[in-house]
Structures are given as structure tokens and as C-alpha cells.
């Protein structure tokens, strides 16, 4: 019975196609003849006659045998009405599908969205929280209810937190977080444009007279510098108030110029630390005053100094001893742990985010130690290999460069170790020249940047272990490097500071000074660079050789890209004084121009 019905449907469909192609005058007798033959078909097949064209369309497309169940009367009327429409007759099959698709699209436009009639508001918020800003904007165009959900304050507050805007704020601080998000993105775009176009302001931090710069460090826009005279100065570049206070020492009986040179300086949000050539260590609390809160003495010269960036922990290395200092519950400083190593320590870092008990990493020649203050445990991470050339740590990893054994054997590499497991994770590089600096803590996730003796800056992919990008940045060795999600700032031994857009593999701009670049630190809106001379012996600083003295004393520059001013068209720092401020010292004039404030 089913085979007979299938043959009958195919025969009738072929007749209808022939009638659609025949002249109009021949359609009427053929249609009358077809109507005369229609009662001959059985009563069981007559109920399906109205749905024959739609069924035949599916059969001609290869749908196979017709379904066993019969269509309802409403469905049959709907299909029959579509089969009698002129557009369906002219389309002859393909047109019917297009018309049906158009009708379905129009019906969907008139339907009420699912969230408007089914879901509670809180559940809709939980679903929308997984959308980004573009998807939220599209959802706001669906209906009025979706617009209210897509512009909820909770969603835009979470977007601000996810993209790093206003991380310390709460949801009650602002009334329209969508507007705040737009303003933050506009500011971010402006800062990126200023970085690329070298648009902003640059200042040279005031130098201590008759001295040579020894060491520079910075944290969150606060700069600390040590000099050959034993002076230590601190600048807060966030307020553009460059009248830097001196951090005094306890030895008031020392005559000016008789204090030992400063070897190392470090700073974080609350502490400043300075190590001197005679083995003394001064610790200042920036919140209480300019006098040190603790003074510690080593028997020999301090070879390495480290300061934790998130708590009050100081680590020093002198001779074969490594000492960790931290305050107790009453606030008095004490020795938290003391270690003895068989070789002299060249590199020392404190692991961040270690909570109560500090952990340090020390490199001594061809040995690498993990030092834990909790039980004074000394764990050997790396031994009996090439000497270590550079070091950096993150919360759970340590990366250090090792010397190569020559191009015949093995090149210089960077080894990445897990601090928790104490085993090697990656071996990166394998280049001819030695790595001179590595930055793991400030790099984006799964990336790391390094500098080499060959003057090249390399980006390493920590997932694959390959070199993602290699830039020929400097003529001499790279001395400092830092990267973020789109740019690299590097400093070389020749005194050149270069800014690169590594996504485009393009150098944006560069600045030159006569001394090696020892320190580089930047944020989204500022950049701090320090050129420290190798030779710290004071040259003749009399009036006749003032230019020689200025050339050999070092330089600290602070760049600010949040202002709408060309960096290299701005007036020099000596020309930024007010009209009533005119000071001189050894002809180092602070000139005053009235048009500066016009």
C-alpha cells in the first residue's frame, strides 16, 4: 500500500510540474481532467491529497519513504494554501523553502524573548555575567527587558575588575559603572597612544651636588637613589613634587663627604633600605620619618640585597652568610633566619606572596639555593653546572640564566624551576652569548622576557618552551628589560633606552644617555629610567669643569604619559620653576620663565 502511494504521489507531482511549465491556456482542461480522475483514488488516500505537494517536495529531495502518521487538518490546510500561492508555483520547490524561512524569521521577530517570560531577574544576571562588553551591547538591543539586564551595575562592575580598572574600589563607589568602564577604556586608549607617539612630559630628578650615582630602585612611582657621598634620597613622582627628602643616618658625627658609598638601595610601599660599602644596613619606615628604624652591621661588604615587595622582609648576603630580617609582633626588628653557603652570593631575591614565613632564592656561582625562614632549611635547586648569570622569581617559579659551554658543546640557556616541587620545568634559549637579565615577575602570563650579551631582547613562551620573538635592540649587552601585554622597554650598556611594540615588531622610540641603563620600571602611565656609571670615582667638580662633572655623575629620568604634552618639546626641569624661585649652586641654575604658567 505504501509503495503504491509513493508512486501515485510522484506521478501527481510530475503532472503539476508539467502544468506549471505549460502555456496558461492548456492548464484548464488538464486541471479539469485531473479533477475528474481525483475521485478514482481511494478514500484513504484522499485525506492526504492536500499535503501531497509538500510531501512530494521532501521525497524529491531524498527524504525517502513518507511518514506513516498522517498530517492534521490544520497542517494540511496550511500546506495546501502555500501550494496554491503564486510565489510557490513560480518557485517550484526552492521558492517555497525561501518563503517559509522568511515567514519563520518574521514570527521570531514578533515572539517574546525567552528571558522576558521564563527566567527570574537574578538568574538572568547570573547567565549574563559570562558575557563580555560586546556581547552585552548586543543583548541590550534585543528588548527593553534585556536592555535593563545588560546594563546592570553588577555586570559592569565585574567587567571593570576583570580588565584591571579601579581594582581597589567597591560597587557602591559609583552609580553608573558602565560609564566608568567607558571612561577607563578611553583613558587606556589615550595612554597607549601617548606611549606610541612619545607624547607626555619628561623630567630629570635633581642630583646631589658633587656626588656620583651608585644605585637606583623604584616601586609604584616612588624612586630611591644612593650616592657616593652616602646620601639616600627619595622622590614621589606620582605627585610631581620633586623636592626629595634625604633619609638621614644615625651617625651624626660623620663629616660630610666622609661617609661610605652606598652599595644597594631597595624600596617598597612602606620601607626603604640602603646597604653601604662598610657592611652597614639602614632600614627606614617611610610612614614614620626620615630616620632609620633599624640598623644592622655585617663584618664584610654586603654583596647582595633583597626587599620583599609585599611585606616587611629584608635579605642580605655578606661573605658566606645570608641573613633574613623581619619585625616581630611588637614591631621590633630581628633576625628571622640565617644561612651559610659555601660560595659568595651574587644574586638574591625574596619570593613574593609567601605569607607568614619568608622564602628567598640565592645564587652563588654554580649553586642555586632555596632558603626558607620557617625552619632555616636550605634546599639545593641547581648544582654542578655552568655559573648563574641572572635571576628573577615569581610567586611559584624561579628563572635564571646560565653560561654556555661554547658553540661546540652547549649554548647559554635560561632554566625555569618550580619552587613548590623543586624540579626543573623548562630549558629555554640555547644561544651563543650569555643572558644578562631576565624578567619573570612583571611579564604577562605564560610569557617571559630576557636580555642577552648579543644585544637582543627575546620573548619566551613558557607553554611551548620556544622563543616567540627576538629583537635586535642594542649595540652592546642588554642591562635591563621589562614588558607588558603589548610593549617592551629595554636598556643597554651603551646608554640607550628603547621602546618596542612587540606585536608589530616595531621600535616606537628611543632615548640616549652616556651611562649604562641599570634600572627600568614602568606602569600604564609612567616610566622611570636610571643611567648609573660604572666608575664611581668623583671627577673634578670645580667651576671650570662643570660639564665634565655633569657628564660623569649619572642620570634619573621620570616620564609621565598621562599629560597632553610632547615629551621632547617640553621645557627642561631647570626651566619649570615659578617666577619667584631662582636658586643657584655651582652655576647649576634653576631658571625661571614667566611663560611656563601661562
UniProtKB/Swiss-Prot annotation:
Transmembrane segments: none annotated. InterPro entries: F-box-like_dom_sf, F-box_dom, Quinoprotein_ADH-like_sf, WD40/YVTN_repeat-like_dom_sf, WD40_rpt, WDR55_POC1. Residues 61-71 have a biased composition (Low complexity). It is found in: Cytoplasm, Perinuclear region; Golgi apparatus; Cytoplasm. Phosphorylation at Ser-85 by mTORC2 promotes FBXW8 stabilization, allowing its translocation to the cytosol in response to insulin. WD repeats lie at residues 201-250, 259-299, 300-340, 341-383, 384-429, 430-475, 476-513, 514-561. Residues 29-40 have a biased composition (Basic and acidic residues). The keyword Repeat applies. It comes from the Eukaryota. Pathway: Protein modification; protein ubiquitination. SMART domains: FBOX, WD40. GO terms for cellular component: centriole; ciliary basal body; Cul7-RING ubiquitin ligase complex; cytoplasm; cytosol; Golgi apparatus; perinuclear region of cytoplasm; SCF ubiquitin ligase complex. The modification Phosphoserine is found at residues 83, 85. Residues 113-159 form the F-box domain. Keywords: Acetylation, Cytoplasm, Golgi apparatus, Phosphoprotein, Repeat, Ubl conjugation pathway, WD repeat. One of its GO terms (biological process) is positive regulation of proteasomal ubiquitin-dependent protein catabolic process. Residues 17-93 are annotated as: Disordered. The modification N-acetylmethionine is found at residue 1. Component of the Cul7-RING(FBXW8) complex consisting of CUL7, RBX1, SKP1 and FBXW8; within the complex interacts with CUL7 and SKP1. Interacts with GLMN isoform 1. Interacts with OBSL1, CUL1, CUL2, CCT6B, PFDN5, CCT2, CCT3, CCT6A, CCT7, VBP1, CCDC8, ARF1, TRIP13, PDCD5 and GORASP1. Interacts with MAP4K1/HPK1 (when autophosphorylated). Associated component of the 3M complex. Interacts with POUF51 (when phosphorylated on 'Ser-355'). Substrate-recognition component of the Cul7-RING(FBXW8) ubiquitin ligase complex, which mediates the ubiquitination and subsequent proteasomal degradation of target proteins. The Cul7-RING(FBXW8) complex mediates ubiquitination and consequent degradation of GORASP1, acting as a component of the ubiquitin ligase pathway that regulates Golgi morphogenesis and dendrite patterning in brain. Mediates ubiquitination and degradation of IRS1 in a mTOR-dependent manner: the Cul7-RING(FBXW8) complex recognizes and binds IRS1 previously phosphorylated by S6 kinase (RPS6KB1 or RPS6KB2). This is F-box/WD repeat-containing protein 8.
Amino acid at each position: 500500500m505504501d509503495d503504491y502511494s509513493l508512486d501515485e504521489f510522484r506521478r501527481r507531482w510530475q503532472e503539476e510540474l508539467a502544468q506549471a511549465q505549460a502555456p496558461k491556456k492548456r492548464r484548464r482542461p488538464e486541471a479539469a481532467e485531473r479533477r475528474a480522475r481525483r475521485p478514482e483514488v481511494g478514500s484513504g488516500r484522499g485525506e492526504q491529497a492536500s499535503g501531497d505537494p509538500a510531501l512530494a517536495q521532501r521525497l524529491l529531495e531524498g527524504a525517502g519513504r513518507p511518514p506513516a502518521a498522517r498530517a492534521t487538518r490544520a497542517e494540511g490546510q496550511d500546506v495546501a494554501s502555500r501550494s496554491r500561492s503564486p510565489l510557490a508555483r513560480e518557485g517550484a520547490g526552492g521558492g517555497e523553502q525561501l518563503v517559509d524561512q522568511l515567514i519563520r524569521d518574521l514570527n521570531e521577530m514578533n515572539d517574546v524573548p525567552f528571558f522576558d517570560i521564563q527566567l527570574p531577574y537574578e538568574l538572568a544576571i547570573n547567565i549574563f555575567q559570562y558575557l563580555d562588553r560586546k556581547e552585552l551591547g548586543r543583548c541590550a538591543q534585543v528588548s527593553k527587558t534585556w536592555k535593563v539586564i545588560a546594563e546592570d551595575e553588577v555586570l559592569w562592575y565585574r567587567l571593570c575588575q576583570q580588565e584591571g580598572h579601579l581594582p581597589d574600589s567597591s560597587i557602591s563607589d559609583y552609580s553608573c559603572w558602565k560609564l566608568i568602564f567607558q571612561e577607563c577604556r578611553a583613558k587606556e586608549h589615550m595612554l597607549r597612544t601617548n606611549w606610541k607617539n612619545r607624547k607626555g612630559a619628561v623630567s630629570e630628578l635633581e642630583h646631589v651636588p658633587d656626588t656620583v650615582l651608585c644605585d637606583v630602585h623604584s616601586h609604584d612611582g616612588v624612586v630611591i637613589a644612593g650616592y657616593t657621598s652616602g646620601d639616600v634620597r627619595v622622590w614621589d613622582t606620582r605627585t610631581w613634587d620633586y623636592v626629595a627628602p634625604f633619609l638621614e643616618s644615625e651617625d651624626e658625627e660623620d663629616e660630610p663627604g666622609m661617609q661610605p658609598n652606598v652599595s644597594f638601595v631597595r624600596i617598597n610601599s612602606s620601607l626603604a633600605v640602603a646597604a653601604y660599602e662598610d657592611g652597614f644596613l639602614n632600614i627606614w619606615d617611610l610612614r614614620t620619618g626620615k630616620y632609620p628604624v633599624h640598623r644592622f652591621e655585617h663584618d664584610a661588604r654586603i654583596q647582595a640585597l633583597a626587599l620583599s615587595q609585599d611585606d616587611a622582609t629584608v635579605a642580605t648576603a655578606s661573605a658566606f652568610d645570608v641573613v633574613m630580617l623581619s619585625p616581630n609582633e611588637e614591631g621590633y626588628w630581628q633576625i628571622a633566619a640565617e644561612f651559610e653557603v659555601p660560595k659568595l652570593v651574587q644574586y638574591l631575591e625574596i619570593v613574593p606572596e609567601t605569607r607568614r614565613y619568608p622564602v628567598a632564592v640565592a645564587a652563588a656561582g654554580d649553586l642555586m639555593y632555596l632558603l626558607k625562614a620557617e625552619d632555616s632549611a636550605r634546599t639545593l635547586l641547581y648544582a654542578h653546572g655552568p655559573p648563574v648569570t641572572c635571576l628573577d622569581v615569581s610567586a611559584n617559579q624561579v628563572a635564571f640564566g646560565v653560561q654556555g659551554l661554547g658553540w661546540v658543546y652547549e649554548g647559554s640557556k635560561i632554566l625555569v624551576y618550580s619552587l613548590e616541587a623543586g624540579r626543573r620545568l623548562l630549558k629555554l634559549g640555547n644561544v651563543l652569548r650569555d643572558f644578562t637579565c631576565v624578567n619573570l615577575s612583571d611579564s604577562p602570563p605564560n610569557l617571559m622576557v630576557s636580555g642577552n650579551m648579543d644585544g637582543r631582547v627575546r620573548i619566551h613562551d613558557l607553554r611551548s618552551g620556544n622563543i616567540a620573538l627576538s629583537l635586535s635592540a642594542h649595540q652592546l649587552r642588554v642591562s635591563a628589560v621589562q614588558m607588558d601585554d603589548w610593549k617592551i622597554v629595554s636598556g643597554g650598556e651603551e646608554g640607550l633606552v628603547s621602546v618596542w611594540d612587540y606585536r608589530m615588531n616595531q621600535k616606537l622610540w628611543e632615548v640616549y644617555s652616556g651611562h649604562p641603563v641599570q634600572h627600568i620600571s614602568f606602569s600604564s602611565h609612567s616610566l622611570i629610567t636610571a643611567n648609573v656609571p660604572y666608575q664611581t670615582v668623583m671627577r673634578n667638580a670645580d667651576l671650570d669643569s662643570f660639564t665634565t662633572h655633569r657628564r660623569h655623575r649619572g642620570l634619573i629620568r621620570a616620564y609621565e604619559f598621562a599629560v597632553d604634552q610632547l615629551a621632547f618639546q617640553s621645557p627642561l626641569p631647570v626651566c619649570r620653576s615659578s617666577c619667584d624661585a631662582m636658586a643657584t649652586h655651582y652655576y647649576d641654575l634653576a631658571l625661571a620663565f614667566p611663560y611656563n604658567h601661562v
